């Protein structure tokens, strides 16, 4: 690899995003209102929050936990929603460690477009599996991202674990 020149890996699902017409709507509100078919990528629905796959994941098993309400800030959510949010993040942690044998996780929120939020009007928490020696987040060090598992396989792996009442 030449310094300053990014490597390119094929990710066909990313191309779909780039060429698709943008609905202008909120992807989280749309997913919350959608049926539970695979197209929605919703893995779990709680009373106040839900879990869905990132359609353009950083790693295998990349989840997002979001409230049903269209809220830009944690401070906009009531205490019950925040309690369920944290509990669902903890449950997601246990499921991802069990399903993917992870060595760690990144958990984070970007508030506002200046902070990197792709959907600034509806906060969501990223839960991203990590492994010792993994090749992900290569974009930080080598301008490359590697994701070997397609989202439909991830959905088939994780949805049953959430519905079984696992961890």
Q: Predicted segment positions?
A:
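HIT superfamily nucleotide-processing domains
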Residues: 1-167
């Amino acid at each position: 690899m030449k310094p300053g020149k990014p490597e390119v890996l094929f990710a066909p699902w990313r191309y779909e995003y780039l060429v698709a017409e943008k609905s202008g709507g909120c992807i989280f509100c749309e997913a919350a209102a959608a049926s539970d078919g695979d197209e929605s990528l919703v893995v779990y629905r709680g009373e106040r929050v839900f879990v869905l796959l990132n359609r353009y994941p950083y790693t295998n098993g990349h989840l997002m936990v979001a409230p049903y309400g269209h809220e830009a800030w944690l401070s906009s959510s009531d205490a019950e929603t925040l309690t369920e949010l944290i509990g669902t993040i903890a449950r997601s942690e246990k499921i991802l460690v069990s399903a993917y044998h992870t060595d760690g996780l990144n958990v984070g929120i970007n508030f506002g477009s200046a902070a990197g939020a792709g959907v600034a009007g509806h906060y969501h928490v990223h839960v991203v599996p990590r492994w010792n020696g993994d090749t992900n987040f290569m974009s930080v060090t080598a301008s490359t991202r590697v994701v070997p598992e397609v989202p439909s396989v991830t959905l088939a792996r994780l949805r049953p674990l959430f519905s079984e009442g696992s961890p």
